Amino acid sequence: MAASKYYGLSIRNLAYRLRKFDEVLGKELVKTVLAHEQEIIEAITEDQLYERGVNGDDVEIMTYAPYAPSTVKRKIRKGQPYNRVTLRDTGEWYKSLRLVYDVDGFYLTSTDDKNKYLKDKYGPKILKLTKENLKNIIYKYIRPELSVKLKKYLQNGTEEE
């Protein structure tokens, strides 16, 4: 009763609007996730790879594919971290990452020539969010925005404001 009073709707109308929102939820989710492409990419490149040197399963990359001694020397010379695999040398690969959506879901891809080599050597999970970062993205960006969209949809009965 409180919901119908709050929105000034009958229960039947409210239920109808909820069903209609369910129909557009997938589209809204895609739009919301793609709107946060940069935050998702930074969670992977900055937190997972550069700061912690882990893949999407939260496994330290150094444990299964450590840097070659020549790479360690080059990293020391450049003043870059060498105690973990960051996959950053010039930063071009990081900058080339893009979030893509297709029938299989969301995934990161890259236009950089090194992408295939890096995925082959370090595994495709280097471009996967850890559970913790996925949770952070959902709670910080996705959930609040979808909640606002749901409230607007219930009030207006449409996607428009």
Task: Show the residue positions of the predicted features.
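Short, Lys/Arg-rich flexible segments
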Residues: 1-161
